[in-house]
Amino acid sequence: MKNYNWATLGCGVIANELATALKSRGQKLYTVANRTHEKAVAFAEKYGIEKVYNDIDELFKDENVDIIYISTPHNTHIKYLRKALAAGKHVLCEKSITLNSDELDEAISLAEKNHVVLAEAMTIFHMPIYKALLEKVNSGDLGELRLIQMNFGSYKEYNMNNRFFNRNLAGGAMLDIGVYALSFVRMFMSSCPNDVLSQVKYAETGVDEQASILLKNKEEEMATVILSLHAKQPKRGTISFDKGYVEIFEYPRGMEAKITYTADGHCETISAGQTKDALLYEVEDMEKAIEGDTALMHLDYTKDVMKIMTDIRKSWGMKYPEEE
């Protein structure tokens, strides 16, 4: 496999994890760009990166850059996706990949036109535990899927200027944490939900602070999702089948699942992967996708989840400034 040159656009928490992931496999980031140049310089010094751009646009023009990881705020993604994809760069973009389905469709068209790989950096699609669970499900040992229950609650202080509650930075529970729960649901459901109901509680800024979502697909598999940015919940999911149920702990970067079988109540534990290596798994799958195994990135699931989120926000009448 080719030794790909990775670049990061953004130098926050995720960019630090990306640099660490590459270091663990004997690599380092080729370059870094950031909206604040001084932060990019400090990031480069921390990780021994030799190249820093004075202007972000220089990143897209650099012929040596193969893959760009975009980790800027949600509402800036489409702007950078347009430039990166048009320049022929492969892109792994932090969730949520775009604000809505129209933006995502545009980005996908650009990727196809320029023959590059575009993917959302959704850890659930790449963590070994979920791949192992899919194998278990597909084996038929658990029978038919009945119900999925997902909870994701964080407790963020009511600082209306931070990105979580800031409408101008595309804040809100749906795009920040809902995307994880809905990606999990889509990964295990037989088809995309076509019957969706929801309720929402708004923060003072007008973004969704809390939401509950009910989903059902044509197979009549069902799911419930509860989200909150101001009420802590355990990051726990349950997948119920007719022969047993699976409990997932500390998703989306889980390492362990417990299966309880209905017939006799006996339990089985499945362990796979390491939480700390979440970005490493994304990097490995992205490079394999560029080599030809594009199914690893599950762009079809990303499209389905984005449509669900877009339709839900439309039903709420909730728009971001870029959508008005």
Feature names for model-found ranges:
Residues 183-255, 283-289, 293:
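Contiguous beta-strand/loop segments that form the cofactor/metal-binding neighborhood of enzyme cores
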Residues 124-196, 204:
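Predominantly a Rossmann-like dinucleotide-binding segment in NAD(P)-dependent oxidoreductases
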Residues 106-123, 144-147:
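Rossmann-fold dehydrogenase core element
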Residues 1-47, 322:
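N-terminal Rossmann-like dinucleotide-binding module
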Residues 53, 93, 118-120, 248:
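Hydrophobic residues in well-ordered beta-strands that form the structural core
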Residues 18, 36, 47-110:
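Beta-loop-alpha module in the N-terminal Rossmann-like domain of NAD(P)-dependent dehydrogenases
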